[in-house]
Amino acid sequence: MFQPPTTKNADPDAPTRATDNDAAIARLSTVRKGYLADPYIAPLIPRAHLQQPRPPLINIGTYLRTRAVDLLLDDWFRLAGRQKVQIVSLGAGSDTRFWRLAVRFIFNTFFFVG
């Protein structure tokens, strides 16, 4: 559980950022253990070289979730053929999927909304 804010100035986005950070570190661990290839994750994590590996269950779960979404997107792109497609990624945080897809596909237009 998250601790209640201790001051009136507590950052209301802190729990969201903490969740994103935890997911990014789990992804880094999964990459370092050889489950996934992702050259973009380490630069997104402060002091990545100091991060400890996550337990095997976290690595396997991160791998399965990533592969499932990647396979769905691959099928979707294949079925679309040369038609224009649109991806709306809500709450992507430090997800590197855009960069990993951009290496394989040509994006004519993209928008980032922070």
Regions found by a protein language model. Give the residues of each.
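Rossmann-like AdoMet
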Residues: 1-114
